[in-house]
C-alpha cells in the first residue's frame, strides 16, 4: 500500500471517529437531560408520598400558561410504562419505577462514556501516527 493512500485512509478513519465521538457526546447530553427530568419527578413523588392531605399545585398547560389545581388523591399516580401504556400505581411504586429508570440511565451513561473514551483513544492514536509520519517527511 502506498504511503499516500495509507495517510488518506487514516484521515478518513479519523474523521469517522470524530463524528462518532460527537454523536456519543450528544447522546450523553440527552441522557443527562433525561436523568435530570427523572430526578425532578422523583423529588415531586417523594413530596406527594410525605403528605396526607390534598395539595394545591400549578399545572403547566403549555405556552407559558399555568393553572391552579387541587390534587385530591396524591397517593395514586398514572405511570407511562412504555409504548404509550399508562397504568395506575401507588406513589411508592411510582417512586421505585422512576428510581429504576434513573439506574438504567446511569448504566447507559457509563457505557456511553466508556465507548467515547475508546473512540477518543483510537482517534488520538491515529493523530499521533499521522504526526509521526509527517515529522519523518
Curated annotation (Swiss-Prot):
Keywords from the UniProt entry: Chaperone, Cytoplasm
Organism domain of life: Archaea
GO cellular component, one term: cytoplasm
Any GO molecular function: unfolded protein binding
Segments forming a coiled coil: none
InterPro entries with a match to the protein in the record: PFD_alpha_archaea, Prefoldin, Prefoldin_subunit_alpha
Localization per record: Cytoplasm
GO term, biological process aspect, one: protein folding
HAMAP family: PfdA
Oligomer and partners: Heterohexamer of two alpha and four beta subunits.
Primary role: Molecular chaperone capable of stabilizing a range of proteins. Seems to fulfill an ATP-independent, HSP70-like function in archaeal de novo protein folding.
Family per similarity comment: Belongs to the prefoldin subunit alpha family.
Annotated protein name in UniProt: Prefoldin subunit alpha
Species lineage: Archaea, Methanobacteriati, Methanobacteriota, Archaeoglobi, Archaeoglobales
